[in-house]
């Protein structure tokens, strides 16, 4: 099933939203030419596998059963975007029978385990390489906002220049999943339908339009996925309530930042803030306050950010550039991580503001997995 040149790789969850983006990126970059893909399905085992440009001329055969541990265990690598429940069920079953292959996973289930590494190679390639050399087998994608933050501000974080920071996020509907994105658009459409005749009349009273919209938001709009209306509003809480006033999404900021960077002791970075769901489709934004360990000028900071990786894009701190380049609309569907609103704050010379945007489905989810697979197969 595997040769030294073209290892077999199990692919699970490839039809979902993150999985679909991952498959498209792998096709775009020619990744299937370096592996023998083995496609698995949780619902259509035996059906035809997708035809992709791999070493077997695109013939990838039939879909395997994603719950067939025996078949999975024959593979040296598995990449999954099937979700946390699948990981809980299958990962432990594989490990308990002695499988020692590489598990590359988009779900958060294994993310904070001591024996796993959160993958974001432009930021922590040294951590990944050390893990591979030391026998680490579980490589997990990070939280989307944390990954996008570090990609944009890597020049500060990697150089040990951040003492602490707060991150106030503006997170897109895609973070909830495909159904959440559909619900957001449906809510916008429903609200528009309530007042379409009034909107077509320039003489109609805007306060009456607003009253009708608000009444529908409060009583008649479908919010099955989000729980409350998001269109024309926001949701000031994401993920579980930890019982201490903090959401799980907010807890991830500090925990994952330090795990990705491998920082501890005196190098530990304190990160906290609030996570907010807004009516954007697929790009997360965040406003940051950072206390630096040194007094750096804004041009020095911009130079560090620009030099760190090819995807971080410094946006000039002007109204025009910010409105055009530092938005979810500008970032969505691209690998660019715009970072702007960089300036010194009134609190002191070591305090700066920053604003980053990144596609939640690319650097926030699929791209780190794609690149980890290339690293694991010796192609990056």
Where are these regions (language model features)?
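Glycine-rich beta-alpha junction loops
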Residues: 43-45, 144-145, 169-176, 222, ...
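A glycine-rich, Thr/Ser-enriched phosphate-binding loop motif common to dinucleotide/cofactor-binding enzymes
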Residues: 137-148, 245-255, 364-368
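Oxyanion-binding "anion nests"
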Residues: 217-277
């Amino acid at each position: 099933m595997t040769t030294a040149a073209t290892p077999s790789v199990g692919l699970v969850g490839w039809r979902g939203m993150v999985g679909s983006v991952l498959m498209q990126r792998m096709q775009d970059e020619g990744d299937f030419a370096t592996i023998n893909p083995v496609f698995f399905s949780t619902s259509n085992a035996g059906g035809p596998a997708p035809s992709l440009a791999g070493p077997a001329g695109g013939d990838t055969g039939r879909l395997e059963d994603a719950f067939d541990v025996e078949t999975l265990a024959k593979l040296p690598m598995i990449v999954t975007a099937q979700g946390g429940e699948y990981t809980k069920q299958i990962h432990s079953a594989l490990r308990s029978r002695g499988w020692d292959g590489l598990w590359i996973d988009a779900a958060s289930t294994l993310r904070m385990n001591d024996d796993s590494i959160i993958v974001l190679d432009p930021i922590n390639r040294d951590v990944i390489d050390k893990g591979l050399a030391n026998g680490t087998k579980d490589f997990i994608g990070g939280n989307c906002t944390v990954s996008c933050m570090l990609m944009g501000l890597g020049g500060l974080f990697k150089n040990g220049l951040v003492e602490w920071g707060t991150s106030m996020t503006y997170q897109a509907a895609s973070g909830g999943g495909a159904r959440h994105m559909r619900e957001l658009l449906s809510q916008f459409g429903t609200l528009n339908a309530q007042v379409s005749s009034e909107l077509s009349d320039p003489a109609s009273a805007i306060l009456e339009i607003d009253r009708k919209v608000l009444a529908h938001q409060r009583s008649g709009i479908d919010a099955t996925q989000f729980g409350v209306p998001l269109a024309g509003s926001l949701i000031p809480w994401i993920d579980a309530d930890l019982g201490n006033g903090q959401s799980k999404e907010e807890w991830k900021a500090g925990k994952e930042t330090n795990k990705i960077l491998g920082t501890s002791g005196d190098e530990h970075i304190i990160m906290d803030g609030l996570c907010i769901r807004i009516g954007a489709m697929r790009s997360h934004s965040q406003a940051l306050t950072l206390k630096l360990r040194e007094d750096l000028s804004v041009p020095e900071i911009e130079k560090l950010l620009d030099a760190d990786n090819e995807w971080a894009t410094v946006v000039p701190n002007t109204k025009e550039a910010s409105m055009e380049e530092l938005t979810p609309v500008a970032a969505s569907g691209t690998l660019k991580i715009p970072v702007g609103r960089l300036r010194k704050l009134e609190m002191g010379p070591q305090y700066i503001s920053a604003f980053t945007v990144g596609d939640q489905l690319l650097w926030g989810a699929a791209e780190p997995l794609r690149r980890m697979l290339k690293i694991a197969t010796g192609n990056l």
